[in-house]
A protein has these predicted regions:
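Aromatic side chains
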Residues: 39-42, 85, 179
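Chitinase-like catalytic core of GlcNAc-active glycosidases
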Residues: 1-76
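A structural motif corresponding to the C-terminal end of an alpha-helix
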Residues: 14-21, 49-50, 76, 106-115, ...
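Well-ordered, non-membrane alpha-helical segments in soluble/globular domains
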Residues: 2-10, 40-45, 94-104, 152-163
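Substrate-binding surface in catalytic domains of secreted glycosidases
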Residues: 44-134
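Substrate-binding cleft of secreted/luminal carbohydrate-active enzymes
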Residues: 122, 127-179
Length: 179
């Protein structure tokens, strides 16, 4: 973990020295729920070492919502992004609007900080299953021959979700991010 922090600090310093206005860092780590205490300690150490002018953001998973360790993780960050896509089994698809809305409401009740919701802006192919589980092709080809099933989200599903969200915007929700 120390090596990660050192590398991150070196990168932000290099970018700033090159004239780039670095305003924050976002950590996208899909920690297992049982590992949230370790993740909290990492974020706490990172927060202590980051310049105070830099914001610290994290991504969060719906699986964390029921964990008693989630508030401690959220306390370390200035903001978060709740990822409500591609968190179910590939057979269930990329996105479930009513379930995502449920997660957003639960998350809003737990987080004391501003947050955004991550929605899918991509598709993927479900190529099949083997002993290791699902073979999913997303950002790079697996070069597997055979038939696959494309997983996408219909624009109307997203529109319906956004309409439901707009009817009762949870506190601290600051917007949507497309992943």
């Amino acid at each position: 973990q120390e090596a990660i922090i050192q590398r991150l600090l070196a990168l932000t310093q290099r970018w700033q020295a090159a004239g780039l206005p670095v305003t924050g860092v976002e950590i996208d780590h899909d920690a297992a729920t049982a590992r949230l205490p370790d993740y909290q300690r990492f974020l706490q150490r990172l927060r202590q070492r980051l310049p105070t002018a830099l914001q610290l953001g994290i991504t969060a998973l719906p699986a964390w919502i029921g964990s008693p360790n989630l508030p401690g993780v959220l306390q370390q960050a200035d903001s978060s992004v709740l990822q409500v896509h591609a968190v179910l089994s590939p057979q269930q698809g990329l996105f479930d609007g009513p379930l995502a809305l449920h997660w957003v409401r639960q998350y809003a009740a737990v987080t004391p900080k501003p947050f955004r919701v991550a929605l899918p802006a991509y598709g993927m192919a479900l190529l099949g299953f083997d002993a290791q589980g699902a073979q999913v092709e997303s950002e790079s080809s697996l070069r597997v021959a055979g038939n696959g099933r494309e997983l996408t989200v219909a624009p109307q599903q997203i529109a319906d979700f956004l309409q439901m969200l707009a009817q009762q915007t949870p506190p601290r929700l600051r917007g949507i991010i497309w992943f």
